[in-house]
Amino acid sequence: ERTLIPAIIPPGTAHPNGVFCVGGADNRILTACAGFASSLLLDFSARAAPKSGIYQAVFDRLPAPCQRHPLLPALLLRTLRLNCLTDAYADLWAECFDPSFTSDSWTIPDRATTPLGDVGPTWTSQTPLRRAVDRRQALVEIDALVALMLGITADQLCTVYRTQFAVLYGYDHDQYFYDAHGRLVPNQVLKVRRKKGEAITEAERTATTYRYDLPFHTYDRELDMHIAYVEFERRLETRGTDS
């Protein structure tokens, strides 16, 4: 599904040699690079040449974000809300917090369950995105942001997704179903739903301690990336007009 799988690790943690890590003095740059690395375009760049692992030589040739780009705060907010899952990231959140975060919003407002800009300078348990549909939307918008920042068109981005990420494309259309509350529906529930359709019972829609409420949806990643790209392009043009 993916080759380049980034994560921001907090201070005091360790990892085996199979994981390559980078660091630096400026955590805003580190966070921006993590956001870039989570995009489909950088994953495509990383897998372009045969390799047994992802080490410095691979990472060094990947494109990096411009630290003066007007869309950088949007990239930082989505990356931070995806990665800052516990209070171990509280210092990172405080250091990277930008007042513009509070005026940011999703490109598809009625899709996510959590307002994007509903954050403050201090990390709380409400800071990270935890619901599956919210995390998916943040990744889709990061894909659009990175493409726009690199001068890649929305059509080119969608072509990369459709032709180079066949497994993800298949999951998006056949496996990744979200319930009415934005939770990812587990396979054991989907198997029954495929047989019985909307006639699936409440007991059959219950797994572990969760009841997954109908209707179940898949989402069109290509359409969502197009919408996000056009909206970020509009915001960028508006910012240029206002400045």
List each model region and its residues:
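S-adenosyl-L-methionine
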Residues: 1-243
